Amino acid sequence: MFINEYGGRDDPTIVLLAPMMVSGSDLYGMMKPHFKGRYHVVAPDQGAHGRAGAYVSPDEEYRALKQFLTETGCTRIALVYGASLGVAVGYRLFLDPAFEVERAWFDGVALARNARFAEWFMKRMFRSRKKTLAKTCAEASPSLVKMYGYDFAKMMTRNFERITIEDIDNICRACCHYDLRKLTDDEQRRLHLDFGEKDFDWKYSRKTVPVYMPKAELVIRPGYPHCAYMAAEPKAYVEQIEAFMGREASCC
């Protein structure tokens, strides 16, 4: 993990944890123009992305993030944001009693204890796409363009070029295994869950959300695939995040 830090530490702290094929600096660059408030933003490049080393495990990633936040005195977090891969670390931060996390926004996560088929399928898919990319040297993967548009797909393709097969295996494992427990009412009222209607991760989470976090705020984006709403509508997306941060919490 490589820590990217923006803004002054006297402002409310936001932690941005990006999905696979998006670095922390990429995610910050996408969101920054649309934030209306002033924030201290911590946007790490997770393993295999940006200026970070290899991706080993979410525990290894979280140790690095926790060390940075603790050493810099950033123990009160206004928002932890995680998308897809980023939720593996964000979930740990949200539930760590060492921190006071006011809000959490998680997008496109397979909330499952052991999604073995999803892990196998993802590994196979990304390995195949890696081989195809090596042969074609495409500037933007056609499959990603179809889901996210050309500019976003170009950025993702650039990041994918440096991800190794070992990184793929470790990332897919991280995305498919969560230590789930029933969240308290207080934890649920501070949590927002976001999914595209066509998101394959929603197929897993739709079974576990009613069991472990039924009172969390839940939004399903009609017609969108995995993490695609954030790419298509970044301005509206960030506005909704800030509205959630400022909303009076309620379990009702």
Regions found by a protein language model. Give the residues of each.
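Gly/Ala-rich beta-loop-alpha elbow adjacent to hydrolase catalytic centers
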Residues: 82-86, 90
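Conserved alpha/beta-hydrolase "acid-adjacent" motif
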Residues: 200-206
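Catalytic histidine-centered segment of alpha/beta-hydrolase-like enzymes
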Residues: 224-238
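Flexible "cap/lid" loop of the alpha/beta hydrolase fold
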Residues: 91, 95-96, 101-132
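Short beta-strand/loop motif that positions the catalytic acidic residue
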Residues: 187, 193-195
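Active-site loop/oxyanion-hole signature of alpha/beta-hydrolase fold enzymes
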Residues: 42-79
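Conserved alpha/beta-hydrolase catalytic His-Asp/Glu region
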Residues: 115-117, 132-185
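Conserved HGGG/HGGXW glycine-rich cap/lid loop of the alpha/beta-hydrolase fold
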Residues: 2-51
